[in-house]
Amino acid sequence: MIRSIVRGFGAALPKRVMTNSEIEGVVETSDEWIVQRTGIRQRYIAGEGETTASLGEAAARAALDNAGLTPADIDLIILATSTPDNTFPATAVNIQNRLGMTHGFAFDMQAVCSGFVYAVATADLYIRGGMAKRVLVIGAETFSRILDWKDRTTCVLFGDGAGALVIEAGEGEGTSSDRGILTSQLRSDGSHKDKLYVDGGPSTTGTVGHLRMEGREVFKHAVGMITDVIEQAFEATGTTADDLDWLVPHQANKRIIDGSAKKLNIDPEKVVITVDKHGNTSAASIPLALAVAASDGRIKKGDLVMLEAMGGGFTWGAVLLRW
């Protein structure tokens, strides 16, 4: 059977690092308060000339280099983002052009922090359906540009960046020992749409708007929703937490990550944490974390890896793959 296998990975971050101490000069907060509640110590902030498209392009080129491929080898680009360069055309098309591609097709996917999980699952469907052999899946965000820098409950949380995977068609036996994507579990519940949102848009206010969040409500639902889809991914593949080599969660908040791992009895040593350095980069957080852990040798060929995320909507999901 056809499996969708990870061929390469890459990441890109803005030049500017903003520490918690710098944020102390913007809003009434402290490094101690931020670290204690979120685990975040710094984040990267896009500067002049740095956009979702430029960061996405850089991550894409890094992933292609890692895979030993060129843009000519790619059939499809899927960009997960909530901060596109323009309302339209899709920022994925902009990245396609930046890569010098005039073949194939490209589109954006918007599921906020769950975007990369949704995009990987979608790439898998295109590959297994025979519409693409190689897909460039990118998560890229410039959340700093939709933050209300007077709102200390949100502006301390988010950062900018991009990560990418090259996923290609391969052969498998149809067992959990196969390399590639083994299962995807995706969910959404729009009754929670007002708990994490941006208060503007072209069809309503005609403005970009700012991010608004009911933090306690998000936290209240996060662990349960995340553990539910992870358990369903294990059930679908006949695997367990003991079989897992790495959990690569959406890097939103260390307390949510720790709570999910504890509820699932996953060893903390198996959890990839980058929220301390990157903050919450929304759809970029999982591919950034994958790039860090694969680059430093933690994630190796044959490892069983769980990706999971929850975002505005609410949206949430998990992908279980063998690296």
Curated annotation (Swiss-Prot):
Homodimer. InterPro entries: ACP_syn_III_C, ACP_syn_III_N, FabH, Thiolase-like. NCBIfam families: fabH, PRK09352.1. One of its GO terms (biological process) is fatty acid biosynthetic process. Pathway: Lipid metabolism; fatty acid biosynthesis. Residues 251-255 are annotated as: ACP-binding. It is found in: Cytoplasm. Keywords: Acyltransferase, Cytoplasm, Fatty acid biosynthesis, Fatty acid metabolism, Lipid biosynthesis, Lipid metabolism, Multifunctional enzyme, Transferase. It catalyses: malonyl-[ACP] + acetyl-CoA + H(+) = 3-oxobutanoyl-[ACP] + CO2 + CoA. Catalyzes the condensation reaction of fatty acid synthesis by the addition to an acyl acceptor of two carbons from malonyl-ACP. Catalyzes the first condensation reaction which initiates fatty acid synthesis and may therefore play a role in governing the total rate of fatty acid production. Possesses both acetoacetyl-ACP synthase and acetyl transacylase activities. Its substrate specificity determines the biosynthesis of branched-chain and/or straight-chain of fatty acids. This is Beta-ketoacyl-[acyl-carrier-protein] synthase III. HAMAP family: FabH (MF_01815).
